[in-house]
Regions:
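Bacterial Sec-dependent N-terminal signal peptides
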Residues: 1-29
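Membrane-proximal, proline-rich intrinsically disordered regions
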Residues: 21-66, 260
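Conserved, well-structured interaction surfaces
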Residues: 40, 44-56, 81-155, 170-183, ...
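Elongated scaffold/linker segments in the mid-to-C-terminal portions of large proteins
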Residues: 47, 85-91, 95-105, 243-250, ...
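Aromatic-lined, polymer-binding surfaces characteristic
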Residues: 148, 157, 161, 204-213
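Short coil/turn linking the two alpha-helices of tandem helical-hairpin repeats
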Residues: 152-153, 159, 200, 223-232
Length: 310
């Protein structure tokens, strides 16, 4: 009996002790996504993810490469499988459900949603210094312009959205005009060029820089001028492309290799001066290709010119 009484008393004391403890303990796992993204570190983490498609799929597997350059006389199907990727190499059976085009479309818009979140949430940050925040936003806008330039160059007048992704899908998207798309792309790239440094943020070679923004800006001007005859304040996009390209060359010393063989030289593979930026993977200090599978080694075996024999 005494043993039972002692056990009950001990249990009662333990319960009373627990009820007396403070319930205001800090539990970081209870923070909401909005709370995390209201901090500089949280937003920086999301901003880093804006790069993920570059090393994850766009430049490490065949899909984007086949969409970007398929249909030209530079590419052929592999000898042992003439039907492989024929939809994008020969436009044989190309349809809306072709995997390569679907993957590119979905990944570009996914990254655009992340870029939009960074741009829009930067004003809500509760910490961080202004220069670092501006740099992250400039990078996000540069990447957003890059992804939109891929979309408009591949699919024409797509839907322009500057809002982050939500749980509710838009079932009736509306196409924007080519002029609206190029105006936004150019506005983003001008902002990036004015706010990024010559050296990458955190000395991370995978991050975009002023050179990236200016190079993309010149290319976008050339695309808009050549494909659609666009103008800006009465000036041809072609003229704008020339001005930006000359600015890059004269002010920043950007140039091409004298010998095209140097473009493909192994010694220049990870530090190529013609590159606008590097799809380096999540660890930019690792010089190995993070997401290269065995299939990646075959990509250029489908290329007729054989650049490694130049």
């Amino acid at each position: 009996m005494k043993s039972t009484i002692y056990k009950i008393a001990a249990l009662t004391f333990a319960v009373a002790s627990m009820s007396a403890c403070s319930l205001d303990e800090y539990n970081p796992s209870q923070k909401t996504g909005d709370e995390i993204l209201a901090t500089f570190d949280g937003l920086k983490g999301l901003q880093s993810y804006c790069y993920s498609s570059l090393y994850g799929q766009l430049f490490s597997v065949y899909d984007f490469l086949s969409v970007a350059e398929g249909g030209t006389d530079c590419w052929i199907t592999p000898a042992g499988n003439p039907d492989y990727a024929k939809q994008v190499i020969y436009y044989d059976g190309l349809a809306t459900n072709t995997n390569a085009t679907n993957k590119l479309f979905g990944q570009a818009y996914s990254m655009i949603g992340n870029c939009n979140a960074v741009v829009n949430r930067a004003e809500l940050l509760t910490d961080g210094n202004e220069k670092d925040i501006t740099t992250l936003v400039a990078e996000a806008r540069c990447l957003r312009a890059f992804y939109y330039s891929i979309l408009v160059n591949t699919y024409g007048n797509v839907t322009l959205t500057l809002e982050e992704s939500s749980q509710d899908p838009i079932l009736t998207p509306q196409r924007n005009s080519i002029e609206e798309l190029y105006t936004q792309i150019i506005d983003d790239l001008k902002f990036a060029a004015n706010n990024l440094e010559d050296t990458p943020y955190d000395n991370n070679r995978a991050r975009v820089t002023k050179k990236t923004a200016l190079g993309l800006l010149a290319r976008v001007y050339a695309q808009g001028g050549g494909e659609y005859g666009l103008t800006e304040e009465g000036v041809s996009y072609w003229q704008r492309a020339k001005e930006v390209a000359e600015d890059m060359i004269l002010a920043y010393g950007d140039c091409l290799y004298d010998d095209v063989e140097d473009v493909w030289a192994p010694a220049n593979n990870r530090n190529n001066k013609e590159a606008l930026f590097i799809a380096a993977g999540p660890d930019a200090t690792n010089l190995e290709n993070w997401n290269a599978g065995t299939q990646c080694n075959n990509n250029f075996t489908y290329m007729y010119p054989k650049p490694n024999t130049l």
